[in-house]
């Protein structure tokens, strides 16, 4: 399979994403160097590893001592990891639906709990599964999304969970809403609320919850006081920064994903001729145009129409007119040697030029998280370690 794709990549492969596993490994090492020695890392690999591929990343990190495990958003994401042989703990950050409770418990996948009915249903499922359900209690300290409140009512909930013999409270956590901002006032307030709540659990209930965690990617970079027992590394795992307001000097990161295609057609249009739907671009002079076989059907944003660019031979080629579902056109007038079959860089480096997810996010009215997460299944993921292809995920591998 790898040799077959390598052959296509060297000729006319329509589009592919290359994932540099060495970059992800280096990012993890640099993050670990910035947190307390005893603090472990939970790699957040929801949305299929932010579009990078959750399974290959989990496999690479599986035997690393400082890794606690992984976080998913849904049971289905977590189940895929277990099916792939991943053994480390997996935490589901969002809501889990009752239909999956029994199987989830058997697979030792940890749900977040913050509703009494969920606790009762999990206890029933645990009895059927014949083993305890390990859970993490979610506390809302200011995100306003899900979680118990850090007050008397929340304290009653913690006691309620602890009283169920079928449940084992492994962890408790909260999530910062503004830790990616330069001003950490809000995040520090959330941290204070969370710490005070933990103190009350210990002093008033006499309970010690083993794994306490609140740091997300931004807090890993700029809030060492929030390390606790574990931190959750999300976007930083993949070499992207949470915002432009966080310090990029403390933890050096390297983007793991590049996106490539090939030119499939070249032609010259003349003054007065238009390109793509709606004729939004009309040439004012002879213009050399190349067609790229990628579009919004692949997750390449339509909002890059007339704004974005690609790299060919290390030079910028601006997008002409609208991005179509499966194709878009670029101006190669300034790249005389460009021809059909040439490699095209949509994300990543070519020579001295580089297109970043941050730039594409800004140009398209999105942001870096969204760009990488929404790249579709029509795009094969090619994994490299030490410069060599080690794995390929192609949803259409039989073609």
Annotated model-derived regions:
Residues 2-25, 76-77, 96, 114-121, ...:
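Active-site anion/phosphate-binding pocket segments in diverse small-molecule metabolic enzymes
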Residues 11, 15-18, 23-26, 37-213:
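Active-site-proximal beta-alpha core segment in soluble small-molecule metabolic enzymes
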Residues 31:
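Class I S-adenosylmethionine-dependent transferase superfamily signal
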Residues 34:
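Conserved PLP-enzyme active-site core in the AAT-like
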